[in-house]
Structures are given as C-alpha cells and as structure tokens.
Curated annotation (Swiss-Prot):
Record-linked Gene3D superfamilies: Metal-dependent hydrolases, Urease, subunit C, domain 1
Superkingdom of the organism of origin: Bacteria
Gene: ade
Designated name of the protein: Adenine deaminase
The species this protein was found in: Bacillus pumilus (strain SAFR-032)
Recorded catalytic activity of this chain's protein: adenine + H2O + H(+) = hypoxanthine + NH4(+)
EC nos: 3.5.4.2
Length: 576
C-alpha cells in the first residue's frame, strides 16, 4: 500500500471521510472474544477500517442479520471439483468460502510445472482468494508412473509467486524418515523461504509423527479419530477436520476439540466433487455439522475462519476487525449457517446462492489437452490367472473413507482365470499407465463396490492419475477404457458394451473446459447412469475408485505394478 492510499484509509477510519461501504444494524461477530457486537462496519478499498458508528457512500441495512467472517478452506485440491479455478469459485463462494489454500498436485502429477502455472494464472481471474502450496511429492512415491517428476530445484522458483504459502502435504514418509536428499532439500527450501509445510500423516506411528515435526511439518488433514488428533496437537501441530466426497471425518474427530485446544483446529474439504459442493456446501457444511454435533457455535465459526488464517500466516483474514480484509458474509440463521450475502474485498460476490461476478478464464496450452496416451487394452492383457486352492488378496473398501483393508477371499475362478463375483461383490480392477503409452498395468481385485452389471472408469486416479477401471466383466472394462481414451480423459459408465454416459475432462484428464453448471448437469447424468449398473450404496464410487490408486494411504492400494501393501511398503501377489 502506497503512502497516499495509507493516509486515505486512516482518514476514513478517523471519520474525516465517508467510507465506500457501511454495513449497518447487523450483529457483528467478534471471533477473538467470541461475542456479538452491535455496531456498524466500515469498508474502504477492500479493507475494514472501522467498527462503531460510520457514514458511507453506500449503506447496507442488515437489520436482523449477523455479519460473520468469510470461511477459509485450509486444504483443497481444486482439480477434484473437475472444473478450473475460475469455475470452482462459482461453486464455493455462494457457500461463504472467501479464501482457499489449494495444492495443485493432481495436475502437477500429469502436467508438471506447466499444469501448476495454468492453475496459478487461472486463479488470478477468480473472485475467490486462492493461495497455493507447492506439491511436495510428484510422484507420490518414487516407483509410481506419473506424467511428471518434480524435484526441489523445479519447485524453488515458484516460491517467488506471492500466492504461494508453502510446501504441500508431505506424503513420502519413507523419504522423510530416511532423510533422502531431494526430500530434505524440499523441506529446507520451504524453511529458508519462511513458508509453512503441510503434512500427510495417514496411519503414522508416534515415532513417525515425531520425525515429521522435527522436519518442521506443521499440519495434518489425514486424521480420522479424536485420539489421532490429540496426538498431533500434543506435538504442536494444527489439525484439519476433513469432510469431502469420500473422506468424511468431522464427526469422528470433533470430540477432540475443546475450549482449551480449539485454536489448533480448522476445516478442509480436501477432495470434493462439484455436484457435492453445489448441493451440500463446503466449509459451511462442516460448521453446520459441528454445531449440530454440539460444538459451541463461536468455536465452529472460529475454526472456519480465524484458525486457518493464523496457521497459514494470512494476517489480514479470518476476522471482522479494522485492518482486516473485508471478506465476510451476512447470515440470517447463525446455527444453520443460512447465508444471504457474501462479500470479498468489500464487493458483493454472491446473494441468495447466486454468484455475481463475470467469469474470466485462460486457454490451456495444447500440452494440457493431450494427456491420455494409454495403450490399446485387450482381454488377454487384463487376464488374472489364479488357482482354486489359495485365497485371493483383495482390497476391501471402507465406504466414505480413504483407508482400505486387506482381505483374504476364497477363489472366484473359471478355467484358471479370475472372474468377478457380483454375489459376493468381488470385482476386477485395472490400472493402466496413461502418460507415456507404456505396456504397464496393474490388475487386481476389489470388494464392496456394489456394481452388479457393467463397469466404470476414470482418469482421475490419485495421485499419478493413470486410467483406472472396475467392472463385472472384461469386455465392459475394456470398453470403459476405450471411451476415456476417445474423450481425452474423464469419467464414464458402461453397460453391455455401451457407454451410458461420459463426462469428458480434456484438461490433463482432470478438468473440464466447460462452465460449472454444465459439469454439474453431466455429473447428475453420470450418477443416473450408475443406477443402471445396479449401484445403490451410500458413497461416491468414482472418488472411491480414484483413491484406490494412492499408495500412501493404508492398508492396500493398486499401482501399475500391482497390489501394494502401504504399511509394509511392498507389492503383494494376488494369491499367497
């Protein structure tokens, strides 16, 4: 801020000049003292300059409403919404989210620095404040087949971007524990730049938590129980309570939060599909849920705003007070988080669920639009030989969780080959390398999916984003793979050799180039098509499928090299 603007702001605060905007007659939330203030709020040049009695060029009468800070999502992969940052803004701003901290490691795993820069530039077009953490593990583990590999030297120049706050979720716990050279350099570079380091401590022991804290990792969003949360807080970490489309952990972790330690907790969505964001909400859903579960409402709102701001060093966000950014919302019902108006930098950006700003986007480079290079798959490529005298090692999904279980199941075979058994809900799963056209694919078995006929497939397969499919028969699995190759990436449902619906994701096989409302409509059509497969369970099968390829979350996952035991960090045979 230059001197003259600084002088002007002080003059408005001192009431020598009228403010551009004054919110009048609302109850104003004081997140510091956790109480209500009866006062006007004056805004000038996107900044709150006063609380008290003020006159404004524009005065908004908010009688009967409450003015609360805008919400902050502390950890989100925008790519999981399947729309670009500018379109993502349209989905979350009406839900009171004014700031997000994003980790673009999905697009980085496919398109490297080119993908990260696309997200950075498009984010500048959004009304939403979008900050970035730099992907720390591309690929997630060294043996993964991703579309890019990012070393410390690749990331270091990006710290000069003002939107970059730090190093994103450090998943490679082996690299940290063994103090591997490049991982050490990534951690040290973040420290030297005085940046925050996010963690990913899924299933880690106390010993490894100590290792992570010694490495200056300050947050974790992979907590699934109250006890895990307390162990991390005890060691000085911030804990994010997560509620996404698959991982739903708020209710289980919430008992850890009390008046003494609440400042170490805040909310995140991590991975949430666009249709869920638009229908259920974002951080507003988590605040609403926490209040319903018995958390003090002031603490819930504080966790939804101030706590995340303080964790990430966003010193002018998260509160309604002089000197803070004018990012706030009016709510008609405090406990139910009924939002009527949302303001970012003092501008009305959403009202009664309608997003106000025009949307500007940038054109993706041709490299981002040509990302699916999978080989042609034949039935013999995905054949899975088994014998009738040994149990099969199977991935058992846990609905609405990212973790899985290793299950031993009696053989399901015909002529020495595995065949899917819908009666026992045991299905074939295939993961095809799609970045370099390699003849490398993992074939395994998964239980608990609930598909009775056909197959589904997606090029969103965390974190390397190869092409993953699951189905009741080989022909439909292959048809689903072919459909996504033709579409240049996306999500598809196939039954009896016919593609029932495909959502194309042409940008790196992860993002649509279409407006949010059209993507939302396509997602609804996709879920209608899912019903034709007999799926009727209470979880998102596409996101569940996509996380079965992430070999850093226990217990077992699939890689292009086969079944992988995460805890013991080794591949497993299908039968043993």
């Amino acid at each position: 801020m230059d001197k003259e603007l600084f002088r002007h702001q002080i003059e408005v605060a001192a009431k020598r000049k009228k403010a551009a905007l004054v919110i009048k007659h609302a109850k104003v939330m004081d997140v510091f003292n956790q109480e209500w203030i009866d006062a006007d709020v004056a805004v000038e040049n996107g900044q709150i300059v006063g609380i008290g009695e003020y006159e404004g060029e524009q005065e908004l009468d908010a009688v009967g409403q409450m003015l609360v800070p805008g919400f902050i999502d502390g950890h989100v992969h925008i790519e999981s919404s399947m729309v670009t940052p500018a379109e993502f803004s349209k989905a979350v701003v009406p839900h009171g989210v004014t700031t997000v901290v994003t980790d673009p490691h999905e697009i980085a795993n496919v398109s490297g620095i080119t993908g990260i820069r696309f997200m950075l530039e498009e984010a500048k077009k959004a009304a939403l404040h979008i900050y970035f953490m730099l992907p720390s593990c591309v690929p997630a583990v060294s043996f993964e087949r991703s579309g890019a590999t990012l070393k410390a030297k690749d990331l270091k120049p990006l710290y000069q971007e003002k939107e970059v706050l730090g190093l994103a979720e450090v998943m490679d716990y082996v690299g940290v524990e063994q103090a591997e050279e490049d991982m050490l350099q990534k951690l040290l570079d973040a420290q030297h730049e005085n940046k925050l380091i996010d963690g990913h401590l899924a299933g880690l022991t106390d010993r490894l938590i100590n290792v992570y804290r010694t490495a200056s990792v300050q947050t974790d969003h992979e907590v699934t129980t109250a006890q895990e949360a307390l162990e991390r807080v005890k060691r000085g970490m911030y804990v994010m309570l997560r509620e996404g489309s698959v991982a739903k952990n708020v209710k289980n972790v919430l008992p850890a939060v009390n008046e003494k330690n609440a400042r170490r907790f805040f909310f995140c969505t991590d991975d949430k599909h666009l249709d869920d964001l638009m229908a259920q909400g974002s951080i507003d859903e988590q605040v609403r849920m926490s209040i319903k579960e018995g958390l003090d409402p002031f603490l819930a709102y504080q966790m939804g705003s101030l706590n995340a701001a303080e964790c990430f060093g966003l010193k002018t966000k998260g509160a309604i007070a002089p000197g803070y950014d004018a990012d706030f919302m009016l709510v008609s019902d405090f406990h139910h988080v009924d939002i009527t108006s949302v303001f970012i930098a003092g501008e009305l950006v959403a009202q009664n669920g309608e997003y106000k700003p025009s949307v500007e986007k940038i054109a993706p480079s041709p490299a981002l639009l040509q990302s699916v290079h999978a080989i042609d798959v034949q039935e013999e490529d995905i054949a899975l030989p088994i014998t009738g005298d040994q149990h099969m090692n199977v991935i058992r999904i846990i609905p609405n969780q990212l973790e899985t279980k290793l299950e031993q199941v009696s053989p399901s075979e015909m002529n020495g080959q595995f065949t899917s058994d819908t009666g026992r809900d045991v299905l074939k799963m295939v993961l095809v390398e799609r970045h370099q056209g390699l003849s490398e694919m993992g074939v395994g078995i998964v239980s608990g999916f609930g598909i009775k006929q056909g197959a589904i497939a997606t090029t969103v397969a965390h974190d390397s984003h190869n092409l993953i499919a699951v189905g009741t028969n080989d022909a439909d699995i292959i048809k689903a793979i072919e459909a996504l190759k033709e579409a240049g990436g996306g999500l598809t449902v196939v039954k009896e050799g016919q593609s029932l619906h495909t959502l194309p994701l042409p940008i790196s096989g992860l993002l649509s180039d279409q407006p949010a409302h059209l993507v939302n409509e396509s997602l609804h059509s996709l879920h209608e098509a899912l019903k034709e497969t007999g799926f009727s369970l209470d979880f998102n099968p596409f996101l569940t499928l996509s996380f079965l390829a992430l070999p850093v979350i226990p217990d077992v996952k699939m890689t292009t090299k086969g079944l992988f035991d995460v805890r013991n960090f080794q591949h497993l045979p299908i039968q043993s």
